[in-house]
């Protein structure tokens, strides 16, 4: 019988995930959270600048539904709150501190107080407003500390980037970073073939694609994030392809990044996927791209903007 081994495999995967210790967030991961929450929650119109100035200053203002849901987004992204448990995760604060304490100048006593404060509050029903009201007093008291812990100062983040060349740097696309990480520098021949969307199937190229999928947030340890792939099609004005994209991914026989990548490239949406993928490469080097009001203007515009990136293999 086939079902039993499959079910057992799923349970084993979940067990391994649950057993893994929580890992501190690096500056790239934190920056992604902030910018993505901006993208998802900043309103259009004249009020946008007001919110942007306030949030940039780490002020959770104005006290309204927009800021409430922005705050929830950041708390989830920084993993200070778990949606599935409807609970704050205060035990992760000292882990974050230990990882960067020699660089971020955070005070250990204050870290303990911050942890205790977060442990003392209740998430209620987990709604945006409930989380906001619970966390706001903690935020206001420990905002300077939390900025140090979660890479929210320009100086602090720059210091960590400089000390950790092994993480993705600002201005570096995830495609370039992953090629560097897996190959230790560009395997120019295979990388050029790969960026021309040839499916070499080599073990190293599969690792590069896995790294890229994780960097673009298409995947994490729990599996494929279909909504993230669909979002990239939406951003190149191809929202009408959503049913087909979902169908292609759902019918893919493998569950690894390279499997999904291959399925998309062997599907009727392959040309649109290439355009979406290339556009995300550009944005992965500049998390503020969309926030500056820039939009997709076609593959030629993407190629032109890619020429200004020094850390990628150009088209």
Swiss-Prot record:
Gene symbol of the encoding locus: D7L2
Protein's cellular compartments: Secreted
Molecular functions (GO terms): odorant binding; toxin activity
Protein name per its UniProtKB record: Long form salivary protein D7L2
Residues of the signal peptide: 1-18
Family statement: Belongs to the PBP/GOBP family.
Organism: Anopheles gambiae
One cellular component term from this protein's GO annotations in UniProt: extracellular region
Keyword Disulfide bond: yes
Alphabetized UniProt keyword annotations: Blood coagulation cascade inhibiting toxin, Disulfide bond, Hemostasis impairing toxin, Secreted, Signal, Toxin
Physiological role: Modulates blood feeding of female mosquitoes on vertebrate species by binding and sequestering different mediators involved in the host response. Binds leukotriene B4 and leukotriene D4. Exhibits anticoagulant activity targeting the intrinsic coagulation pathway; binds coagulation factors XII and XI, preventing generation of activated FXIIa and FXIa.
